[in-house]
Design a protein with these regions (language model features):
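Conserved structural position within tetratricopeptide repeats
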Residues: 42-45, 76-79, 112-113, 144-147, ...
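TPR/TPR-like (Sel1-like) alpha-helical repeat modules
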Residues: 283, 297-321
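TPR-adjacent "capping" and linker segments in tetratricopeptide-repeat scaffold/adaptor proteins
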Residues: 2-19
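Conserved alpha-helical positions within TPR/SEL1-like repeat arrays
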Residues: 18-29, 52-63, 86-97, 120-131, ...
Length: 321
C-alpha cells in the first residue's frame, strides 16, 4: 500500500525537523548557542510537537541567560512528553539560576523517577540540596552521580563545595584535585581550591593555585581579589594593594575586596585611602542587604520558605561581615 501524498509530506517534515534538532544539539556542544537556538527554532517550525527540540531550545536559551524563557520551553516539552528527561533537567537548572532551589529539587526528583540512573539529575539534586543548606545530603547525591559517571567534573567540584561548607577543607581539596586530574584547566576548581587553602591558612600554596587560575582566565577579578587577600594575610600589603586595585578596576562591586583594601591601606598608614575603601564596602553592603530582604520577602509571599530562609541567611552573612 503506497503512502498518501499528505502522509509523505508530514513524514518528510518530521525528518527535517529532527535533522535541525540534531544540528542544534551539535552546535550547542560547540558552545555556539545563538546558532543552536536558531536551529532548534527551525526544527520546531517544521515539527512543533518535537519535545526534545523544545528542551534543546530551552537549553540554548538558558546558556544565553534567558532562564524564564528556558522554563517556558521545558514546560512545553513536558506537556508533549512528560517523560522527557532533558526537559526536566533543563527546567531544574533554570529554576536554580533564578534562585528557586526548592522548585529545582522537585524537578530533580521527578527526573529521577523517570531515570534513576541519570548522573546529571543526581548532581543537580545535590546542588539544590546544598543551596538549601543540606550539605551532607548533597555529598550523598554527588557520590551517586560519581558512581554512575566517575569522571563527572561538576559532581567532583560540587562534592568539594559541600565538604567546604561543612568545614572539612582537606576533603574538599581532594575533590578539586580529582577534578583537576581529569581536566587541569578547570578554572572553577582552581578558584575553589584556592579558597579552601585560604581557609586552611596555607596562603602561599593558595597564591600558586590562584596564579594558575589567572593564567587560564586573564583579568579575572575574583582570582585577583583572592590573591590580594592572601598577600594581605602574609603581611605583604603593598603587593596586596596592587593586586586588589587590579581586581576592583575590573569589578568594583566586590565588597570583600574593598574591605581587604581598607585593611592593607591602614597597615601602610594610608588612612584616607583606607577610609574611602571602607565606605565603598559599606555602600555595596547596604545595597546587598536591601536586595536580599526584598527577595526574601517575595519568596515568603510565594510560599518558597526554604529559598526565603536562604536569602535572609545571605543578608545575615553580609551584616556579620
Amino acid at each position: 500500500m503506497s503512502e498518501s501524498p499528505e502522509s509523505a509530506v508530514n513524514s518528510q517534515s518530521l525528518k527535517s525537523g529532527y535533522e535541525f534538532y540534531l544540528k542544534g544539539h551539535a552546535l550547542g556542544r560547540e558552545g555556539r548557542h545563538e546558532d543552536a537556538l536558531l536551529a532548534f527554532s527551525q526544527a520546531l517550525s517544521l515539527d512543533p510537537n518535537l519535545a526534545i527540540a523544545w528542551a534543546g531550545k530551552g537549553f540554548a536559551l538558558g546558556k544565553l541567560g534567558r532562564y524564564e524563557e528556558e522554563i517556558e520551553c521545558c514546560e512545553k516539552a513536558i506537556s508533549l512528553d512528560p517523560y522527557c528527561v532533558d526537559a526536566w533537567n533543563n527546567k531544574g537548572f533554570a529554576l536554580g539560576m533564578l534562585g528557586r532551589f526548592q522548585d529545582k529539587l522537585e524537578c530533580c526528583e521527578r527526573t529521577l523517577q523517570i531515570d534513576p540512573e541519570s548522573a546529571t539529575a543526581w548532581n543537580n539534586k545535590g546542588v539544590a540540596l546544598g543551596m538549601l543548606g543540606r550539605f551532607e545530603a548533597e555529598i550523598q547525591c554527588c557520590d551517586r552521580a560519581l558512581e554512575l559517571r566517575p569522571r563527572y567534573l561538576s559532581a567532583w567540584v560540587n562534592r568539594g563545595y559541600a565538604f567546604g561548607k561543612l568545614k572539612w577543607f582537606e576533603e574538599e581539596i581532594i575533590c578539586y584535585d580529582r577534578a583537576l586530574r581529569i581536566y587541569p584547566f578547570y578554572f572553577s576548581a582552581l578558584i575553589k581550591k584556592g579558597i579552601a587553602l585560604i581557609n586552611l591558612k596555607r596562603y602561599t600554596d593558595a597564591i600558586d593555585v590562584l596564579d594558575r587560575a589567572h593564567s587560564i582566565e586573564l583579568g579575572n577579578a575574583k582570582a585577583l581579589y583572592l590573591k590580594g587577600l592572601c598577600l594581605s594575610m602574609l603581611g605583604k600589603h603593598e603587593a596586596a594593594v596592587d593586586c586588589l586595585e587590579q581586581a576592583l578596576e575590573i569589578n568594583s562591586t566586590i565588597a570583600d575586596a574593598w574591605v581587604v583594601m581598607s585593611n592593607s591601606c591602614f597597615m601602610l598608614g594610608r588612612l584616607e585611602e583606607s577610609a574611602r575603601a571602607f565606605d565603598k564596602a559599606y555602600y555595596i553592603d547596604v545595597k546587598d542587604v536591601r536586595s536580599g530582604l526584598v527577595k526574601g520577602l517575595s519568596l515568603l509571599k510565594m510560599g518558597k520558605f526554604d529559598d526565603a530562609i536562604r536569602s535572609f541567611s545571605n543578608v545575615l552573612g553580609v551584616l556579620l561581615r
